[in-house]
């Protein structure tokens, strides 16, 4: 099929914070759509999930995109993953299994039973590695990740490339001393584990999609957002996409390039050849004091594309220094809408402990990368169990699968002795529990299913929830002292806001907020 070479644009759009890059990109898309371009002939890719979610929502609202049409808006990793059907993503359960097997001889891996994991671990969520959660193994695999984003010439010789990168770039600063032989061992076993189980991680998605046998689709319009955050490896994917696309629009702000620590290389964006460069002239978000601070800082950036813009808002804004959170405690309350951020997560811990002590719900993003979003301090599973208990108190019925989750979190002696396991295990439970059409009231549970709990009591007197953030010998600085401490926090939060939804406080590193 002969390609239609009607489109030949190569454009770079620069815009500071609040200058309307997304709005400008959507105007570009609208022009093409108005001229007859079909939605599936335009691909929009971004660095982070937040970027993609925003683009999808706006295309649904402004262009009446269907759920099928929004499938042409995705992260770079998701685009690559969609071309790798024969692989499974490395999940949290897979990560735990690897860490367990790493302590044994690979020859004996086949003899090790796969352990049972929580329901959340079993879900297809991307697993990420970090030193806080995974210790030295996480730090080593972060080195591997950085190497793969930076060493592209011959990664088929992965171990050699990795060790060359390690020898050239590794300097101290880690909590643990990492030796050469440890890096070699963990990398070798990690690759063996992934191959044995047909698994891929974030870097594999990109690397394997670059293989010549993987054919990318043809697009008349390719739009790439947040270009300043892309690594060399991600730019390789963009290069492959652009070779098979007619028009290319690159949007970003090199002044906001703060992901160099994870392999991003803003110089590629700065030097990428285009026919036209467009600078968005005004920020509609920043008040004057914040704008002035940002402008003062840009003078310290050695190389930039000259993305100069003016402030549009009349408001001055507030810029203050505080010594402790108590100075703004009148603003930190139910209904607050704010971001608490710091350069590193250990600085954010202070925010989290403060919010925990006063009983406010918050969302956080710690060292997780592209695969994770902000997670609430009160999990969805906890909220659902509390809501279901409230339903039972009103005389309403709930599904059998919800009954099983509810009974699992009961305190001791609230089920007839010896019956609890049979009620919460899918292989042993009453078959009617698995019937999605049936509902069970509390009177039914009490009469037929050995439940001894008092329906008149508050959920706090019935359940004892678990948390992975309770102090142990391996986690001496975890957030909660014990399960009682965690459940007391849940009680305080519920008493302030039974919906757990009124407060919108984000706690994150600066990088996490931006991503």
Residue ranges: model-predicted function:
Residues 1-15, 23-24, 41, 120-223, ...:
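Accessory N-terminal region flanking or inserted into the helicase ATPase core
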Residues 1-91, 292-295, 508, 513-514:
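P-loop NTPase Walker
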Residues 16-21, 27, 47-50, 221, ...:
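Conserved helicase motor core of SF1/SF2 NTP-dependent helicases
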Residues 19, 49, 78, 288-291, ...:
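Core RecA-like ATPase module of SF1/SF2 helicases and allied nucleic-acid translocases
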Residues 31, 60-64, 89-90, 239-243, ...:
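Glycine-rich, phosphate-binding/catalytic loops in enzymes
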Residues 41, 46-144, 358, 363-370:
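Conserved P-loop NTPase-based nucleic-acid remodeling module centered on helicase motor cores
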Residues 72-75, 201-209, 503-511:
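Conserved two-lobed SF2 helicase motor
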Residues 320-336:
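Conserved interdomain hinge at the start of the Helicase C-terminal
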């Amino acid at each position: 099929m002969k390609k239609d070479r009607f489109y030949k644009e190569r454009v770079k759009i620069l815009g500071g914070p609040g200058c309307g890059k997304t709005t400008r990109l959507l105007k570009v898309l609208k022009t093409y759509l108005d001229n007859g371009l079909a939605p599936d002939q335009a691909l929009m890719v971004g660095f982070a999930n937040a970027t993609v979610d925003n683009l999808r929502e706006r295309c649904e609202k402004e262009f009446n995109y269907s759920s099928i049409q929004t499938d042409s808006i995705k992260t770079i990793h998701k685009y690559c993953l969609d071309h790798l059907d024969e692989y499974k993503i490395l999940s949290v359960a897979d990560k735990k299994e690897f860490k367990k097997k790493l302590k044994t001889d690979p020859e004996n891996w086949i003899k090790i039973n796969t352990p049972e994991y929580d329901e959340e671990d079993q879900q297809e969520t991307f697993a990420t590695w970090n030193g806080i959660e995974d210790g030295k193994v996480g730090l080593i695999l972060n080195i591997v990740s950085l190497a793969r984003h930076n060493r592209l010439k011959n990664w088929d010789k992965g171990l050699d490339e990795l060790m060359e990168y390690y020898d050239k770039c590794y300097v101290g600063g880690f909590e643990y001393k990492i030796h050469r032989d440890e890096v070699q061992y963990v990398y070798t076993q990690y690759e063996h584990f992934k191959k044995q189980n047909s698994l891929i991680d974030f870097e594999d998605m990109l690397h394997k999609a670059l293989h010549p046998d993987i054919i990318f689709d043809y697009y008349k319009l390719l739009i790439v957002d947040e270009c300043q955050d892309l690594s060399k490896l991600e730019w390789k994917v963009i290069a492959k996409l652009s070779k098979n696309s007619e028009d290319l629009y690159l949007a970003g702000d090199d002044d906001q390039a703060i992901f160099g620590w994870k392999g991003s290389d803003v110089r590629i964006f700065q030097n990428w050849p285009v026919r036209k460069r467009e600078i968005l002239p005004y920020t509609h978000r920043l008040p004057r004091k914040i704008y002035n601070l940002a402008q003062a800082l840009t003078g310290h950036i050695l190389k930039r594309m000259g993305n100069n813009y003016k402030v549009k808002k009349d408001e001055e804004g507030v810029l203050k220094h505080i010594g402790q959170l108590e100075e703004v405690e009148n603003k930190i309350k139910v209904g607050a809408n704010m971001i608490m951020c710091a350069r590193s997560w250990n600085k954010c811990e202070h925010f989290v402990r403060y919010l925990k002590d006063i009983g406010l719900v918050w969302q956080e993003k710690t060292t997780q990368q592209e695969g994770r979003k902000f997670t609430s301090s009160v999990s969805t599973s906890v909220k659902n169990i509390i809501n279901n208990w409230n339903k039972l108190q009103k005389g309403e019925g709930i599904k059998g699968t919800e009954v099983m989750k509810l009974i699992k979190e009961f305190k001791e002696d609230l089920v007839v002795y010896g019956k609890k396991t049979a009620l919460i295990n899918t292989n042993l439970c009453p078959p009617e529990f698995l019937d999605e059409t049936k509902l069970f009231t509390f009177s039914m549970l009490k009469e037929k299913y050995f439940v001894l709990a008092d329906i008149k009591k508050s959920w706090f007197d019935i359940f004892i929830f678990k948390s992975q953030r309770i102090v142990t010998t391996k986690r001496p600085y975890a957030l909660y002292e014990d399960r009682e401490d965690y459940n007391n926090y849940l009680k305080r939060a519920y008493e302030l806001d039974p919906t757990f939804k009124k407060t919108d406080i984000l706690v994150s590193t600066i990088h996490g907020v931006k991503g």
